[in-house]
Amino acid sequence: MRPSTTTLSLLVFLISSILLATTGKNSIIRYTYFPILLIICHLQLTNPPVNTASNIFDGSFEGTTLLNGLQQLNILVLTGVDVNDESGSSVFRRLKSALIYPFNARGVGTKYQIKNLPVLSSFICKEKQGESGLSSFLSSARYRFAIRQLAVSAWQYLLADIGFSLLKNIPTEKRLEYYGPEEEWMPQSLDQLRVRIEATLVFWVTLKAFAEIQSKIATALLTAVGVTSPHDWPPFFGSLREAYTLRGFWGKWWHQQLRWPLTSYSNFITRRVLKLTRSPLERYLNNALVFAQSGIVHVYFNWIKGVQDGDVGCMAFYISFVAGYFLEDHVQGLWRKAFDRTSAQESSLWLLERLVGALWVATFLTIVTPWWVYPFLRLSSSLKMPYSFVDVFGFQGALTVVFMGAAALRIGLNAEP
């Protein structure tokens, strides 16, 4: 009997943590672990997919196994993290530090911390003194953080429930008409264009909410019991106000969980193997390699979820952003040259630039998102949460709670859900 994907993931985590705590940066033992890691990853990749008929969370853990393997290899070999530099000589302290890295994909609080991390809300960071009762409880940044995380995650669960309900509750004949094979590439009518715009908007709003739920619950619990502090967990996503360019969309607004491992591999290829100097060629090749790796990770998730015809569209979606970056960079360069200013200078036309930029990003996403998403939308059975409040209270009732909840979170907890 073959070990489960979960068992293999725990094995990778355990071995990697022990090696990280007990070996140095250039230890030969780390390199001998590489073929073992490849074998384990092969077993994970060739395990049969889980049953996809239950809900959207099924397979989520298995879907991260490939990324986890890539991150372990990055930490041990490519980046070569040495916890002796950070934790002194105590084996216990080195092991504690080593256990953090597999869960710290953004390198928070280390010298490997990625760029453009969002900052914690002032609601969490501000000090409150001399209060009693509930106010005294809330004077602790730790508990304010936990309460805020749990409250926002509950709101996001309901929002994701609404989004998946909108995508799921479509008659079969309409589903095939709108999302059928080959429909993802180009709309053939105004009605299909309308559906394309609606599906893209609902998908990204829903995915953003869904992607944060498990993280917020886990970080709330870890912080509430004192294992971590709020400063260990900068916001998972940045501000939507930064998403007026494609680079801002991926580099400042969207989550950065893949950034460190994937850029480590792309930099290894471009700078250490190909010996490229910093140049436009090196930059765009790095972009292409990062998006190609991201595409492969998400194709694996497709397989886990039982999506049989989405591999080409998924890869095309991610690779398309290289062309988008190229076009965006050159148009911005021409614009700055026309107004004789550097990229660091603030333009008097900043509002126009952001409006045009937001329209550009929305248009690009509307074109390419269905390439990736429509094969998922053809599988209505998995487009649901473990428990649907929409099925119980109705769409209008759930939507009312979402709007009221958003206002309450903003006013009471200074949250931007």
Swiss-Prot record:
InterPro entries: Wax_synthase, Wax_synthase_dom. It is a multi-pass membrane protein. GO terms for molecular function: O-acyltransferase activity. GO terms for biological process: lipid metabolic process. The lineage of its organism: Eukaryota, Fungi, Dikarya, Ascomycota, Pezizomycotina. This is Acetyltransferase nanB. The chain crosses the membrane at residues 150-170, 284-304, 307-327, 356-376, 389-409. The keyword rRNA processing does not apply. The gene is nanB. It is found in: Membrane. GO terms for cellular component: membrane. Acetyltransferase; part of the gene cluster that mediates the biosynthesis of the benzazepine alkaloid nanangelenin A which contains an unprecedented 3,4-dihydro-1-benzazepine-2,5-dione-N-prenyl-N-acetoxy-anthranilamide scaffold. The first step of nanangelenin biosynthesis is catalyzed by the indoleamine 2,3-dioxygenase nanC which produces N-formyl-kynurenine through the catabolism of tryptophan. The two-module NRPS nanA then utilizes anthranilate (Ant) and L-kynurenine (L-Kyn) to assemble the dipeptide product nanangelenin B. Belongs to the wax synthase family. Pathway: Secondary metabolite biosynthesis. Keywords: Acyltransferase, Membrane, Signal, Transferase, Transmembrane, Transmembrane helix. Its EC number is 2.3.1.-. Residues 1-24 form the signal peptide. The keyword Membrane applies.
